[in-house]
């Protein structure tokens, strides 16, 4: 029996001819990632294990993005600990205030991760890089510590689910609608410890940003990882960024999948995940009138330049609704700068939105937009659990940037076509 894309990457890095689901393997890593929340725990474990060196200073990335710029003394202390570790071990890819971005937007942008890589990160949304045809997954801080020291990690080879993408998305429907549609279909445990493998003729109609968004939320379906077939769009993106050679892994024609889903992109409508689970999805006709207090456009899911562009298009010459707050967060400094160059920031500010420096901030209820009791927020982030963005009685509605921007203008949950 043949292997899937994920299985081929794992077999290669484990030095094996083949692997099967449920095999336990040790595999060599191409990148180990941590942030300002998870890295301090990894550093403590690193020291407790009495490790004396890192395996490769060029294959570790530390990104201060969650509570940065530091929101309080504890956050500052954690960042200082990471800063000292990066200096002591001469870590090449250390990003702090000034060059920092939201990690899962920053690493692909900078070419630090690329096609065919095996990546672990002490952050659950590390699965984002599967958009590039990499095997990428989140781990705990202890595994991060061992990875930094040895360059290896253990894996249980996952079973696979295949998603055949067909057709083309409608105007103002994007990758966020696709992944919310899928999660609504299979549930938050529908891909539990599985690899979600995306391909099909519809792939050519999805941008890299669409794919990054979709892969980012594979974890919200319980997946071990999400991974996309590599095509000309992927290769063009990678060649413009990475300085490393890369290898493309293609699934065998006789690869085995537990399930196969055909996803008709043409039929997907604006989709929103209602509180308090990403699987609690509703399409536009079923939304009803939901009055909102806040909109957040940004995060590792939807803080990329294309997201800023569509938000600016919708907000151009419009005004944020009275009694509605709109917070926009470009995910990296380069995206922020390009927003300035293209006039997006002027559009946002004239509309009545506030623009933040890159940060994860409100997504995890950290800072830059915490919700009070009973407040409702439309957000382009990836989780809407109870209390995720603030008070336990607040509500988070997960949406695309298109829906978020339209909702900010009307003050109620809306789609772009609802704006006169």
Swiss-Prot record:
Q: Does the keyword DNA-binding apply?
A: no
Relay the cofactor remark from the entry. Answer: Binds 1 [4Fe-4S] cluster per subunit.
Reaction(s) catalyzed by this protein?
(2R,3S)-3-isopropylmalate = (2S)-2-isopropylmalate
Has the keyword Translocase been applied to this entry?
Answer: no
Which residues does the record give as [4Fe-4S] cluster binding sites?
A: 300, 360, 363
Matches recorded under InterPro entries: Acnase/IPM_dHydase_lsu_aba_1/3 (IPR015931), Acoase/IPM_deHydtase_lsu_aba (IPR001030), Aconitase_4Fe-4S_BS (IPR018136), Aconitase_4Fe-4S_dom (IPR036008), HAcnase/IPMdehydase_lsu_prok (IPR011826), Homoacnase/IPMdehydase_lsu (IPR006251), IPM_dehydratase_rel_enz (IPR050067), IPMI_cat (IPR033941)
EC number of this enzyme: 4.2.1.33
CDD domains linked to this entry: IPMI
Q: Which GO terms describe its molecular function?
A: 3-isopropylmalate dehydratase activity; 4 iron, 4 sulfur cluster binding; metal ion binding
The UniProt keyword set, sorted, is: 4Fe-4S, Amino-acid biosynthesis, Branched-chain amino acid biosynthesis, Iron, Iron-sulfur, Leucine biosynthesis, Lyase, Metal-binding
Cofactor(s) listed in the protein's UniProt record: [4Fe-4S] cluster
- Give the record's pathway: Amino-acid biosynthesis; L-leucine biosynthesis; L-leucine from 3-methyl-2-oxobutanoate: step 2/4
Q: Name one GO biological process term.
A: L-leucine biosynthetic process
Its function?
Answer: Catalyzes the isomerization between 2-isopropylmalate and 3-isopropylmalate, via the formation of 2-isopropylmaleate.
Q: How does it assemble?
A: Heterodimer of LeuC and LeuD.
Q: Which family does it belong to?
A: Belongs to the aconitase/IPM isomerase family. LeuC type 2 subfamily.
Protein name from the UniProt record:
3-isopropylmalate dehydratase large subunit
């Amino acid at each position: 029996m043949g292997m899937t894309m994920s299985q081929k990457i794992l077999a290669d890095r484990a030095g094996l001819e083949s692997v099967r689901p449920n095999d336990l393997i040790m595999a060599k890593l191409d990148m180990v990632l941590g942030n300002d929340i998870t890295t301090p725990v990894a550093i403590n474990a690193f020291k407790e294990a009495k490790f004396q060196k890192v395996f490769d200073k060029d294959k570790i990335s530390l990104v201060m993005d969650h509570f940065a710029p530091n929101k309080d003394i504890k956050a500052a202390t954690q960042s200082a600990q990471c800063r000292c570790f990066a200096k002591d071990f001469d870590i090449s890819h250390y990003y702090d205030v000034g060059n920092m971005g939201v990690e899962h937007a920053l690493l692909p942008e900078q070419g630090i991760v690329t096609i065919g890589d095996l990546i672990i990160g002490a952050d659950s949304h590390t699965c984002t890089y599967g958009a590039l045809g990499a095997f990428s997954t989140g781990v705990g801080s202890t595994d991060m510590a061992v990875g930094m020291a040895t360059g290896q990690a253990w894996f249980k080879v996952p079973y696979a689910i295949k998603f055949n993408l067909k057709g083309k998305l409608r105007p103002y429907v994007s990758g966020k609608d696709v992944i919310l549609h899928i999660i609504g279909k299979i549930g938050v445990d529908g891909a539990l410890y599985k690899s979600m493998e995306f391909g099909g003729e519809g792939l050519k109609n999805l941008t890299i940003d669409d794919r990054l968004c979709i892969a980012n939320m594979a974890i919200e379906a319980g997946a071990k990882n999400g991974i996309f077939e590599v095509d000309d769009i992927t290769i063009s993106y990678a060649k413009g960024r990475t300085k490393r050679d890369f290898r493309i892994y293609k699934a065998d024609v006789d690869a085995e999948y537990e399930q196969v889903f055909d996803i008709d992109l043409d039929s997907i409508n604006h989709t929103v995940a209602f509180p308090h689970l990403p699987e609690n999805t509703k399409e536009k006709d079923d939304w009803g009138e939901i009055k909102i207090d806040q909109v957040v456009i940004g995060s590792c899911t939807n803080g990329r330049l294309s997201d800023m562009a569509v938000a600016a298009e919708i907000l151009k010459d419009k005004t944020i609704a009275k009694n509605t707050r709109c917070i926009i967060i470009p995910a990296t400094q380069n995206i922020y700068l390009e927003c300035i160059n293209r006039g997006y920031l002027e559009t946002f500010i004239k509309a009545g939105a506030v623009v933040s420096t890159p940060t994860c901030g409100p997504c995890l209820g950290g800072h830059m937009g915490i919700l009070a009791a009973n407040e409702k927020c439309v957000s382009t982030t990836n989780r809407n659990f109870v209390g995720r963005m603030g008070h336990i009685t607040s509500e988070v509605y997960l949406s695309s940037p298109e829906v978020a921007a339209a909702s900010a203008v009307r003050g109620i949950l809306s789609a772009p076509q609802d704006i006169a």
